[in-house]
Regions:
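Conserved C-terminal helix/tail region of periplasmic/extracytoplasmic solute-binding proteins
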Residues: 335-411
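Secondary-structure end/capping motifs
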Residues: 252-362
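Ligand-binding pocket segment of bilobal, Venus flytrap-like solute-binding proteins
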Residues: 90-92, 192-227, 246, 278, ...
Length: 411
């Protein structure tokens, strides 16, 4: 053995590490006992602004810091996101809140595959866009007579969301119903992947859509639509996207899950430093991520809202990634989601809400990861939540589901 190889070998031994001033157990980026079980992790994302914390953790080396060799895979639709996580082609994924529940329960065409939510990626920052031909409509109540007239003429209006059990579907249903419009009876509701929304509105395939940024502002920039409302006006600091894993992967790789969460904590803090947002917008605007002009991404990231109908404002409730206890996976939100599945007939009869929520929402991973980072966690779960039209009590989701005049309750 030559001298160079001997030194390399010695460096790998406990004595060699000690001689070099490194603690025994140190594995380069983490103590060996804390090293992730699986170091190669493939992340699925969709071309939306709220993929930012996953992308920036990759770009800034935060995944690497915690022993994760990350690969980012941009997918074409939420169905592909679900399927690749289900099949193990991706190990962690950018996902709509609601999708892990649908997969765990086998709802709406999802194969049964238990999934877990240990981390909320972001809050706020989605919107509903209407075609410019509807300018003048400011509320769902304004829209109702137009919807009714079209229905009577056998020219039913069409609205798009991104995935049936997901956030955009629920926000669109919630908004339409607030104006007395039944999303299952009065209009046609279709599924379109986020990056394809603007192109489909250009060819008059729909009258409106609900999606995340930057596609609402892109519709304004392209001169085809305007923002009638944002989702934060329905529910301030609502949950939006999550970082999801299959239950099987999380059970086998708990240290990997925690390493991912630690990296996301750092990237989320980085993004919520507003001085970093211009550079973040530039990074995520790349063709390999969102493929959209950085200026269109940045405006609403900064809370600068031009609604495209003459209304402009600085919205204090812009998209957040870390602030205001953003990342905590609160069970309250799971109960709300299940109440909406119930309201819209996606499940039949009362559900075992607690059993389902406890299985999917996993604050234990979050709490352990933050404790290991020395980060103090705050916030109280299972508290009433105020929405635009009332208060949700997570302790009685069945009563809440039955409280709406517009519904599709089944069983």
């Amino acid at each position: 053995m030559n001298r160079r190889n001997a030194l390399k070998t010695m460096a790998l031994t406990p004595l060699g590490r000690l001689a070099a001033g490194l603690p025994i157990g140190w594995a380069g980026t983490a103590y060996a006992s804390d090293a992730p079980e699986t170091s190669d992790v493939r992340f699925g994302i969709i071309a939306l602004t709220d993929c930012a914390s996953i992308v920036m953790a990759h770009e800034l080396g935060f995944f690497k810091k915690f022993g994760i060799n990350s690969v980012i895979s941009k997918e074409a639709s939420w169905a592909v996101i679900r399927d690749k996580l289900t099949l193990g082609e991706n190990h962690a994924t950018h996902m709509l809140f609601g999708m892990p529940f649908a997969s765990s329960m086998g709802l709406l065409g999802s194969p049964v595959k238990p999934m877990v939510i240990p981390w909320l990626l972001n809050r706020n920052g989605q919107a509903i866009t209407l075609s410019n031909k509807l300018k003048g409509v400011k509320t769902a109540k304004d829209l109702k007579p137009i919807v009714d007239k079209a229905k009577a003429a056998n020219e039913t209006m069409t609205f798009a969301m991104t995935f049936p059990p997901g956030t955009h579907a629920m926000w669109l249903r919630y908004w339409l119903a607030s104006g007395g419009i039944h999303p299952d009876k009065d209009i046609s509701l279709i599924t379109i992947p986020p990056p394809q929304m603007v192109a489909n509105m250009k060819i008059n395939k729909m009258d409106g859509f609900c999606v995340g940024e930057p596609w609402n502002l892109r519709a304004i920039s392209d001169g085809i639509g305007y923002t009638v409302t944002t989702t934060q006006k329905m529910w301030v600091d609502h949950p939006e996207k999550v970082c999801a894993f299959t239950e099987e992967f999380a059970n086998k790789n708990p240290k990997t899950v925690k390493a991912v969460l630690k990296a996301l904590h750092l990237s989320s803090q980085h993004i919520d430093n507003m001085g970093n947002r211009p550079a973040v917008a530039e990074t995520i605007s790349k063709a390999s991520y969102i493929n959209c002009q950085k200026e269109i991404i940045l405006d609403r990231l900064k809370g600068v809202y031009d609604y495209g109908n003459g209304v402009k404002e600085q919205d204090p409730n812009y998209m957040i990634f870390s602030n205001r206890n953003c990342n905590a996976p609160m069970k309250t939100y799971g109960y709300w989601w299940l109440s909406q599945f119930r309201r819209w007939g996606m499940v039949k009869g009362p559900q075992n809400y607690k059993q389902i929520v406890d299985k999917v929402i996993r604050p234990d991973y979050y709490m352990e990861a933050m404790k290991e980072l020395g980060v103090k966690t705050t916030g109280t779960d299972m508290q009433p939540v105020k929405l635009a039209d009332g208060t949700f009590n997570p302790n009685d989701p069945e009563k809440y589901a039955k409280s709406f005049p517009v519904h599709s309750l089944a069983g």
